[in-house]
């Protein structure tokens, strides 16, 4: 079976140029997101903003992204996927310029809400449903999980390199504002990759609303569970995790970036392992039995007696927690019909983004009120609950290749 024999290849055999371009664009965006996820909270912290204010700003970015994602899913039938990707690139460029020029907190809130800034180590932007549906359309069913694994691998590995590059402005004697301008410039590079995409990434029924139909109950159920998982993740998005490490163990920006880089490398490697594992035990079992131990490791983090133990738990979590990402994305695209894919991708992504947005604000308040890492304990507990509910509710709902 291919997934068990050739999972190690950089790309599945026979993938199209469209898939390669989408993976490259994801890597480019993830690289600059990785830099921003480290620099944004520390920059705001040095500017005198409290953890609660920083959490509010991160919440604004996630709520804005969620609403944009919902709009993309609702109105995507009005234009081609390439045209929507072009609009997303314009929004990304404007976001970078806005953060580079703004200094007032209220202005930053507006830019965060309307823009594409990503405080998470994963992708929560309006690019996500567009790229997911394009990948599902361009990939053969038997290659779908492997393609999504490479998509996640490209994003996580590039994001890890981005976190490692976060101290670069300080080394070069540049203000952090230069990184925000670089973020905006990367939007031009992303559009250069999206522009040559072929008609194969488009849904044939452009101009027809892709509403949910026979798969409505499945998508609603998955959206609710994904929201619970993302609510837990919101308590320790990478920006807040970086701030917790930076403050709790009194380490430098370079050390913080290095820790999160190696965590990203561990996550990236796990995506490839997820492919043969899913081929053996199924998508849902892979999602649950790798994610649950990682949730327990998060709950153990507040009790880490020193930096070494904390780093060990973080790396162990990273090696397990994201195996559910390519399998989850593949599962959603598999259990709905092709015309429903844009709406399904948008609804699940919106549920995740809105739920994630709640966490940073509460976590910021908790970090202000107490020195104990309550956000990690609560967030890990919510994610463990999600794992058990997902197994109970969807273990019998099989994708076509498992039936």
Predicted regions and their residues:
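Helix-loop boundary and gating motifs at the non-cytosolic
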Residues: 12-63, 218-226, 230-260
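Hydrophobic core of transmembrane alpha-helices in multi-pass small-molecule transporters
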Residues: 27, 95, 105-126, 309-323
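Transmembrane alpha-helix termini and helix-breaking/packing motifs in multi-pass membrane transporters
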Residues: 41-46, 159-179, 243, 247-248, ...
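Conserved MFS/SLC helix-loop-helix module at the cytosolic interface between two early adjacent transmembrane helices
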Residues: 67-103
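Helix-to-loop junctions at the C-terminal end of transmembrane segments
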Residues: 68-80, 170, 270-283, 367-368
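Structural signature of the two symmetry-related core transmembrane helices
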Residues: 83-98, 285-300, 380
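Glycine-rich segments within core transmembrane alpha-helices of 12-TM secondary carriers
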Residues: 146-167, 351-359
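C-terminal membrane-cytosol helix-exit motif in multi-pass small-molecule transporters
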Residues: 162, 166, 184-204, 386-394
